[in-house]
Amino acid sequence: MKLLKIIPILAMMMLGALTSCTSENDTDIVTAVSDSSAKNQASIHAKIELEEVNLGRAEDFAILTKSGITNVYPSNITGNVGTSPITGAALLLRCNEVTGTIFTVDAAGPLPDRVTDAPGLTTAVGDMQTAYTDAAGRSNPDFLNVGAGIIGGITLKPGLHKWTSTLLIPTNIYLDGGADDIFIFQVAGTLTMSSAVRMILKGGAQAKNIFWQVSGAVTLGTTSHFEGTLLGKTSIAVQTKATVNGRLLAQTAVTLQMNTIKKP
């Protein structure tokens, strides 16, 4: 009789142990799934957070300005060139320097290949300004004031980079990322690249995915090499024989001196 009384008790104890074990395992599984889901959501959120800057019609241009383009002959430009609202007389490139179309607001631009398209240029310049505002307005930078504004000899990763004052590039730098990775650089002051300095892409990074928003004047030193689209609030000066794999989009003027500019 005692044995019969003990058996139900033992059965209940075993059932409780099994239930407890199962519950604990289930909790571990749920926790693991939750952690994995949270990480995945964070990863997806990070990727969605930084989108490329939409250039609109400005994307079609290698050089686009509001107040003219000066030039020391010869330069070699691959991509369209335009200036607006200033007269085409302020665009001082020759037709044989441009592999693309030269757009002006009037008949004063260089002949014989100049195309007059005031409405199209108005749209492109408006899109350029919108793109600048977009890039400048991106918040929550991944990297803030790297190198205290002096970034020679370092490798920059994809993401949103911000400098709250001037930026100097005194020696070579590297941009390391995949083919689809986006780089956005916000510079609150001037941007200066020293002479003979090179910007080098690694890991499949592409110039078309690199955007530099600069509040102050931009100076690219003699024989330097630059990668990406420059969205300048003021002027962009490209010194003697410097090269650019990207775009020069300036809200004032661009100055050239025997340069090679190639739209990505």
Regions picked out by a protein language model, each given a short descriptive name:
Residues 1-9:
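Bacterial N-terminal signal peptides that target proteins for export
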